[in-house]
Curated annotation (Swiss-Prot):
Annotated EC: 7.1.2.2
The protein's assembly and partners: F-type ATPases have 2 components, CF(1) - the catalytic core - and CF(0) - the membrane proton channel. CF(1) has five subunits: alpha(3), beta(3), gamma(1), delta(1), epsilon(1). CF(0) has three main subunits: a(1), b(2) and c(9-12). The alpha and beta chains form an alternating ring which encloses part of the gamma chain. CF(1) is attached to CF(0) by a central stalk formed by the gamma and epsilon chains, while a peripheral stalk is formed by the delta and b chains.
Ion transport recorded as keyword: yes
Enzyme class: translocase
Protein name: ATP synthase subunit beta
Function: Produces ATP from ADP in the presence of a proton gradient across the membrane. The catalytic sites are hosted primarily by the beta subunits.
UniProt entry keywords in alphabetical sequence: ATP synthesis, ATP-binding, Cell inner membrane, Cell membrane, CF(1), Hydrogen ion transport, Ion transport, Membrane, Nucleotide-binding, Translocase, Transport
Principal place of residence: membrane
Similarity remark: Belongs to the ATPase alpha/beta chains family.
């Protein structure tokens, strides 16, 4: 095993000299044995660049506490590899593929390197099939695609993680396939909550969790998405199954890349991001794809800094997505959850050929009513409702009902709201909204449409108001 010595330590970045000149390859894993407070640990670092003829610059994937100059470093001769296969189900891993849930050690039959090429062009397949989520606003106005990529865009605190947790809950129960969750740079508490909820709901046995949380060094946050993806790829390629990959949060992946880039001394580009932002995002996203063997359907939460969708990190992710679910602060301020913007959210399959004539026409009419209501809001604010035509008054009343009806109680939020969660089938969603836009329920009070499942629930709720 080739050995070197630490020459310089700057935070997570290590310069390591290999005297005999046999330099480790880019992305190779290096091992450093440390002894901090009598506790022996192995720190793993990943080679990023070669500097000069005898040295490499590497990024540590765990804390560099206790490291000193001159310390010995071993070249493993291979990239970071993570365990794959059935043994990983129901467990939590870190970026290095080590279990962190205090459970029994796993028997590893196979490992795979986290750096892999994307499937070649002739291996790919494109199915256009709608993926039912049970969430009305998504299924109706911005449907997801089986084997596609979806982004959940939103600022801080508008409900991205809750929506992802509800999707995991709905899909794991209805879909029955394997799910892989990558926690990239998010709160440890949320990761813990998710694990406990999955255990309670019984879906943990079909799920792999891979965490690189906020408190970890940037190297771990940058690579944990690749570790999770490698596990998902194995289920797709070797078992030939449909896999669900959840990433929370893809912005933290870009943010960690920016930190690593700055530590490595690269010149920053727009808004201080790394010059390789597009390349890194592309390398990750191109591997999340469907092949002839199986599919990976991916849902990615994307934090939008300062609610600015033109920021390079979310803007870069946009290019890779089949559907976008935009969460709006203005809607969450009204108390409507999920706070999905029905006019900003988009989907590649929003056409009659895929959705069917009825679904497409209902969705477009809902959007038309909401858009007209939005256009009229200035007039209402300045002149009041009395200045509107009779038709517009009816439309505004209907739009307000639709707005409320797009809310839905979630299973994962039951403990906070006290309202039992609802899974609404796509056919029920289309039928319910068709009834509302037809004016069949204009006589029901607006509040009857708030936080219910299908139109039948709204009718039932309205009876309580009449009484």
């Amino acid at each position: 095993m080739n050995k070197g010595k630490i020459k310089q330590i700057i935070g997570s970045v290590l310069d390591i000299e290999f005297e005999n000149g046999e330099l480790p390859e880019i992305y190779n894993a290096l091992e450093i044995e440390t002894n901090v407070s009598g506790k022996k640990e192995t720190i793993i670092a990943e080679v990023q660049t070669h500097i000069g003829g005898k040295a490499v610059r590497a990024i540590a994937l765990s804390s560099t506490d206790g490291l000193i100059r001159g310390q010995e470093v071993s070249n493993t001769g291979k990239p970071i590899s993570v365990p794959v296969g059935d043994a990983t189900l129901g467990r939590i891993f870190n970026v290095l593929g080590k279990t962190i849930d205090e459970g029994p050690a796993i028997t590893v039959k196979e490992t795979r390197p986290i750096h892999r090429a994307a499937p070649s062009f002739d291996e790919l397949t494109s199915k256009t099939e709608v993926f039912e989520t049970g969430i009305k606003v998504i299924d109706l106005l911005a449907p997801y695609i089986k084997g596609g990529k979806t982004g959940l865009f939103g600022g801080a605190g508008v409900g991205k993680t809750v929506l992802i947790q509800e999707l995991i809950n709905n899909i794991a129960k209805q879909h029955g396939g394997f799910s892989v969750f990558a926690g990239v740079g998010e709160r440890t508490r949320e990761g813990n909550d998710l694990w406990r909820e999955m255990k309670e709901s019984g879906v943990i046995d079909k799920t792999v969790l891979c965490y690189g949380q906020m408190n970890e060094p940037p190297g771990a946050r940058l690579r944990v998405a690749l570790s999770a993806l490698t596990m998902a790829e194995h289920f797709r390629d070797s078992i030939g199954t449909d896999v669900l990959l959840f990433v929370d949060n893809i912005f933290r992946f870009s943010q960690a890349g920016s930190e690593v880039s700055a530590l490595l001394g690269r010149m920053p580009s727009a808004v201080g991001y790394q010059p390789t932002l597009s390349t890194e995002m592309g390398a990750l996203q191109e591997r999340i794809t469907s092949t002839k063997k199986g599919s990976i359907t991916s849902v990615q939460a994307i934090y939008v800094p300062a609610d600015d969708l033109t920021d390079p990190a979310p803007a870069n992710a946009f290019a890779h997505l089949d559907a976008t679910t935009v969460l709006s602060r203005a809607i969450s301020d009204k108390g409507i959850y999920p706070a999905v913007d029905p006019l900003d959210s988009t989907s590649r399959v929003m056409n009659a050929q895929v959705l069917g004539e009825e679904h497409y026409l209902v969705a477009r009419e809902v959007q038309r009513i909401l858009q007209r209501y939005k256009d009229l809001q200035d007039i209402i604010a300045i002149l009041g409702m009395d200045e509107l035509s009779e038709d517009d008054k009816v439309l505004v009343a209907r739009a307000r009902k639709i707005e409320k009806f797009l809310s839905q109680p979630f299973h994962v939020a039951e403990v906070f709201t006290g309202a039992p969660g609802k899974y609404v089938k796509l056919a029920d969603t289309v039928r319910s909204f068709k009834e509302v836009i037809s004016g069949n329920y204009d006589h029901l009070p607006e509040q009857a449409f708030y936080m219910v499942g299908s139109i039948d629930d709204a009718i039932e709720k309205a009876k309580g108001y009449k009484g």
